[in-house]
């Protein structure tokens, strides 16, 4: 069982991701803001972080930058862009920015499960 942090401001998306992850046997932490998500990442060092890009306080791009600049174990966390940004080039932009992978919404269940499992230690 892995610990996965879901940072998502939309309650329905956060609930769905949580449900899918728990059904797969994972412990789920959740945050509705980047600030809280970063704090949880630092405190708990989850095995994986699913980070929405369009968060209300700090966007996911800046949140990733803060995580990567922490150094040590926090900087090494696996972080997936989890976003409704699904235009041509968005995936490449996310990977170039340092995300470990990219999941678009609405969620494709098989892709979601495969991506999560591929990134877990």
Predicted region positions:
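Conserved acidic carboxylate
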Residues: 8
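Two-component/phosphorelay signaling modules centered on CheY-like receiver
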Residues: 11-29
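Acidic catalytic/metal-coordinating carboxylates
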Residues: 12, 33-36, 59-65
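Short hydrophobic/Thr-rich beta-strand motif most characteristic of the beta2 strand and flanking loop
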Residues: 25-32, 40, 103
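Short amphipathic alpha-helix used as the core "switch/output" element in two-component signaling
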Residues: 39, 61-75
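The feature encodes the CheY-like receiver
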Residues: 56, 87, 105
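C-terminal output helix
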Residues: 107-116
């Amino acid at each position: 069982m892995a610990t996965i942090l879901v940072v998502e401001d939309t309650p329905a998306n956060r609930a769905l991701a949580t449900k899918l992850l728990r059904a797969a046997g994972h412990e789920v932490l959740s945050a509705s803001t980047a600030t809280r998500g970063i704090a949880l990442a630092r405190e708990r060092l989850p095995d994986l972080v699913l980070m929405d890009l369009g968060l209300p306080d700090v966007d996911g791009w800046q949140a990733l930058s803060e995580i990567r600049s922490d150094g040590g174990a926090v900087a090494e966390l696996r972080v997936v862009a989890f976003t409704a940004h699904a235009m041509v080039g968005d995936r490449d932009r996310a990977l170039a920015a340092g995300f470990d992978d990219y999941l678009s919404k609405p969620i494709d269940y098989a892709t979601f499960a495969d991506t999560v499992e591929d990134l877990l230690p």
